[in-house]
């Protein structure tokens, strides 16, 4: 099993300087950044430290992933936030758990033994609500269905149709935003009864940069997807 650590960035120079020295290159087979056209020196720092990177052309986290996907060498992808929210010491146990034959392993902020120091009342409630609804409506057993910090098979994206624009275009046009695919990945993986595990991992507060959440718009999209997915059977 080969693993690619995929790190999407947009003006995260402070987080990179603090977090990347904690990540040993030998933990994974590839470290790949995808940069959303940062203006704070992020790309220069990535170059100076000898990391692979892709410059994103279309806006939105989903397109960051899609544009990075052809450059991924691993058969397992571990998505990681460099803003301080993802604790680096969970990388090795997440990979070891994947080696047990799981399709996806989530580093959960809300599993027993973990906590989030980044949540406020609104985001904490939203994460709990959507995770609970995904479990109720789609047969999941998650404590954290929304988090970026997770490992999964690279080809899972194609199996679940997450690479296809048609599965996002209605809601993104309706609510004038672009979203990531983690919630939809959680829904479809649960509905397909894939092998899913969670390990606990704290979520520290963000380090520098600007929080990019669009709470109302993203929440509206996720609610739309949650209802729509109850009636979809073909992901191709």
Outline where the language-model segments fall.
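Donor nucleotide-sugar binding loop of glycosyltransferases
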Residues: 12-15, 38, 61, 87
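Short aromatic/hydrophobic "clamp" motif used to bind/position activated sugar donors
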Residues: 77
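Short, well-formed alpha-helical segments that are part of the catalytic scaffolds
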Residues: 11-25
